[in-house]
Amino acid sequence: MSVLRFAILLIYFTLAALPLVWMGLTALKTNDDAIARNVKFIPSAAAVPTDSRRFEMTTQAWSNLQKPSPLTGRSFYHYLLNSVIIGSLSTIASVCLATCAAYGFSRFRIAGAKDWLFFILSTRFLPPLAVVVPILLMYRELDLTNTHLGLIILYTAFNLSLAVWLMKGFIDDIPRAFEEAALVDGYSRFSAFWRINIPQALTGMAVTAVFCLISSWNEYAFALSLNQGSEAAKTVPVYFARLQGQTTGIPWPTVADR
């Protein structure tokens, strides 16, 4: 049985890793080789028939990371740093707020708790594109356009509903007896929450953080519409969209090495 399990895991790992391996190999190709019909899976400088293209390893795509764009004067690392800052801070804020809210819904008697939870979840029903214009007008009045803070607040608000529901499920699974024992020993409610619930909910917080980070990292519409006329807070998805809009075609090696 162990051999069968190992074989199944090996097949699964191979299938899961194949796209990543191919993307890494594409990053070592030239633009012509990336779209050539006759290519080799393993990079090699060996000669191929004259009617085919030569497949050679190159670091041209990697060197493009440090080159500022002629249109914006910014390199890829600028957009990567923006994504890291905005994604990480919005994720931390979402998880912290959601954990506190989920603890309240899980441990206290709140009038209309089910209705409040449904209302929180219902904020996910509305497509984000439906509120781009009103949020843009509001952000202009608050002077939050072209800022990291504006996107952090927005992503935190959008991720909060999913985060609350996820964290409530994890906190519901933590036995109340642990907190009650801590309260009997003289712990305050906050101390019991901090010392008892948080350590046991770390797994749930990590899972919630992954979902929030993925959502913030991949968001495109607000990252573009709230950063018009400035590159200060634009993120990686906006950078990728600009690459795809080039008239010379999509530079697949440059896209792959990111």
Task: Briefly describe each language-model feature range.
Residues 5-258:
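A structural signal for multi-pass alpha-helical bundles of membrane permease subunits
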